[in-house]
Amino acid sequence: MGLDMRPMGKPKPGFERRFVDIFELVTKDKIPQSSFLDKLKGKKYPTRDELLQEWFANQIQTYETIKAPRVGRDKEAYEWIKNKYNELEQKPPLAQFLKEHDGYYVIELAKEQDGVPVYIAMGQDENVFRGQFLQDCIDIIGEDLVNEAWETKLANETLDYGNRLMAVADKIAKERNLEYLKTQRLPPDSDEGTIESKLHIVYSLAKWLIFYGKNGHGYEADF
């Protein structure tokens, strides 16, 4: 399967502390259990599912942060879904098709492109970074920095990780006269395994991490 780095939602205003508390309870398996005495007193603690339901209900989705247009709200999303409809061989009624896709975020039209990677995985949202590509970069940035990608992080840790990757990438780019890769969105026209190819992966991930981290989002390491 390999590593996919999935950006997490960020807490709604006023939910910041509770967001972190629930995250730590769930990820560290510290969900409180009712004792026998608690049960006698009628005291109940929320279950894991109840905590997750509360956690997700109080998030701002990453699609909003990358400013992805939404079907049923934005004109460009309507034009996009209409084109998809016109491409169908078997067409249901247009009204039915639009209703089925109401609320869909069109990530490929997102205005904040640093949050939409070019290194993606099949079957995942377009803003999920295929972290497995970083495995090819051990020889240029070191095993510790690569392995850190496999750790789920909240926003501050995500931003810090991105900044450290960026600093290493900048150093390598300066030494090899490859600074142009920092602002190049698409992969370089070079063979896989070259320093150019590897450095572009590192730059792309660093920018992705910095974008989400500075905007209050962490990421889930899914592997």
Roles of regions detected by a PLM:
Residues 1-211, 215, 222-223:
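Acidic (Asp/Glu-rich) sequence patches and key acidic residues
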